[in-house]
Amino acid sequence: MKTIHVSVVTPDGPVYEDDVEMVSVKAKSGELGILPGHIPLVAPLEISAARLKKGGKTQYIAFSGGFLEVRPDNVTILAQAAERAEDIDVLRAKARKSGRTPLQSQQDDIDFKRAELALKRAMNRLSVAEMK
């Protein structure tokens, strides 16, 4: 079966690099499925997970938004932060998730938005960690 090369990169360095059969991500415009030979594309990404299918198995990588660049023979995900499912610290993610209470009592819009984004990132990391 044909494959496409995938690189997931953060400011701290590469998180994932391999050849896969299919990549699925959630872009701002909706869900994208990328196969080898896909037309060139650049898209902003939501806080979500990339699903990478190879040899009948699926790997998951949580990322906190970013950009997707697609070329016919490779896919690059540029993210501020990204973690493979097996690398996620579940206790740390749960601690962030339990920070929901300040979200309900905050009056300041900036603090509310920051808390909301932190909650989304934590929930995304937990859902990806459970997919191991």
Swiss-Prot record:
Q: How does it sit in the membrane?
A: Peripheral membrane protein
Q: Name one Pfam family in it.
A: ATP-synt_DE_N
Q: Sorted alphabetically, which InterPro entries does this protein's record hold? A: ATP_F1_dsu/esu_C_sf (IPR036794), ATP_synth_F1_dsu/esu (IPR001469), ATP_synth_F1_dsu/esu_N (IPR020546), ATP_synth_F1_esu_C (IPR020547), ATPsynth_dsu/esu_N (IPR036771)
The organism sits in which domain of life?
Bacteria
What terms describe the molecular function in GO for this protein? ATP binding; proton-transporting ATP synthase activity, rotational mechanism
Could you list this entry's UniProt keywords, alphabetically sorted.
ATP synthesis, Cell membrane, CF(1), Hydrogen ion transport, Ion transport, Membrane, Transport
Compartments where found: Cell membrane
Query: GO terms for CC?
Result: plasma membrane; proton-transporting ATP synthase complex
User: What functional role does this protein have?
Assistant: Produces ATP from ADP in the presence of a proton gradient across the membrane.
Q: Which family, according to UniProt? A: Belongs to the ATPase epsilon chain family.
Q: How does it assemble?
A: F-type ATPases have 2 components, CF(1) - the catalytic core - and CF(0) - the membrane proton channel. CF(1) has five subunits: alpha(3), beta(3), gamma(1), delta(1), epsilon(1). CF(0) has three main subunits: a, b and c.
Protein name per Swiss-Prot or TrEMBL: ATP synthase epsilon chain
Q: What gene codes for this chain?
A: atpC
